[in-house]
Amino acid sequence: MNESKPGGPPRIALVTGASRGIGRAAAIALAKSGAHVVALARTQGALEELDDEIRALRPTEPEATTLAPMDLRDFAAIDRLGEALYRRWGRLDVFVGNAGVLGLLTPLHHLYPKTWDDVMAVNVTANWRLIRSLDPLLRLSSAGRVAFMTSSAASQAQMRAYWGAYAASKAALDALARAYAAETVNTSNIRVMLINPGALRTRMRATAMPGEDPATLRAPEELSAKIVEICSPDWTETGKLYDFPSDRILSFRAPA
């Protein structure tokens, strides 16, 4: 499904955590679909490698990407980001909130306050600051699309021990995304989705599950086509969860 209409202006897509893993795969897939990708990550070198790969895919378009090296704990920089995007393009069509940190897998009473604060800052507060900064631009799009990467750790019936900080942050992100979907569904063309990628071959997964054979896991590139679909103008669902392992769209329901 094409992200940008042939002959029309490219859709502008911001991807956080774009230097590796799911974010990198999403950035490349969006670029292949014709979008201009604003790639945000902390690591300048990895962003430049991403830029080189996208340039190789679109050799006649030397400016198919814009690199935005940024630490998402720098909230003032997030506040400036929306203004910078508005000055250049006057809108934002796609926001993929992918960046996240695992933190330390340890009992809650052993967790350092700084570790807790870092997990919440990146996984929750940064996404709220991004919504706050980007909402005016998404409303200026004819089809603003937002996709946040969540985790089954937030909603498993049997909560996993030692994952408290990460699970709490993703549960908060779920609520944040659903609230934003409810706020925008009748007042804009914005549609908001949560995506559970499941177990993929990423650095975070390797850190969390060091004994797992990565060859048994699916690659992030397998998810990227669905991210492009969810971020396309044709997508109409909002406030729901796309579960990649089961390939299903799930609605949130209160317990019976």
Task: State what each model feature region is.
Residues 45, 69-80, 113:
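The beta1-alpha1 cofactor-binding region of Rossmann-like NAD(H)/NADP(H)-dependent oxidoreductases
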Residues 190, 194-195, 202, 210-256:
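C-terminal helical subdomain
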Residues 98-105:
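Conserved NAD(P)H cofactor-binding loop of Rossmann-fold oxidoreductase domains
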